[in-house]
């Protein structure tokens, strides 16, 4: 510290002291800013080169304009496994190969806990234990696809049908049963191909554990991409605000552990009086996609082909 005892003139000493104190304050401000920055979660960076995806029903596979989609900047197709029953394995795997040549990854989309038109609880209420035999059956389906070269597995109905709280026991928690399935699936398919992409459709609710058993923070430890279905038009009988879209999307990104979050959006609106579906034009869908780029999420998934006009998304994330 400067001292007047060094023989420095009083006026010069006073000037030097003021300069020195300003420098100290600047360093203190810089240190505080660095500390604040370190405490904040950094902006999420996409792990995948292309993060634009489409949900595609199996029955629509043959009509899907995949060359057009590739040109418009879509990189992932979530193909419902019903395509195998509709078209046969040979045609489905040929479709997957064609998409791969165009730079698009096909994920097989199937229902985890919805079988033969009915919800299946992953917990045996009498035994108060998970239904391991059912887990094994579903996981074996996924393993079969990965063994044949499928690069992505997309889980739909990876939840309870609104009744999780009725199957929740101290010995076997409802949320744990969903997470445990994700863990077992991860271990099984990554042993075949460590790079296979696991994704899951999520209910668009900040607290979905009570009804659906989904805990994104735990599921995100085993699932690569969480896809909350943030359907703002006609959800629960009303159109949701843009603020709701941002709030839900960002909540998932903040509570997804290591998983990426790609937001599912509609390609249609709804008539709130009679429920009729109203296809959206490309401009409207693009506007909703751009809204997602204003969140901390890193991708969009359009639901679905067959309704609405898909926009060009090549410049969406630039």
List the predicted regions and their residue ranges.
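Active-site groove signature of glycoside hydrolases
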Residues: 137-172, 301
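Aromatic-lined substrate-binding rim segments of carbohydrate-active enzymes
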Residues: 78-114, 169-192
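Aromatic-lined carbohydrate-recognition surfaces of secreted/lumenal glycan-active proteins
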Residues: 57, 107, 178-212, 259-268
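Active-site-adjacent "subsite" loops/lids of carbohydrate-active enzymes
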Residues: 92, 96-97, 105-148, 278
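Aromatic- and acid-rich polysaccharide-binding/catalytic face
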Residues: 212-242, 305
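Catalytic domains of carbohydrate-active enzymes, especially glycoside hydrolases
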Residues: 60-85, 148-152, 295, 299
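Substrate-binding cleft of secreted/luminal carbohydrate-active enzymes
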Residues: 231-237, 262-318
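Boundary/entry segment of secreted carbohydrate-active catalytic domains
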Residues: 43-69, 268
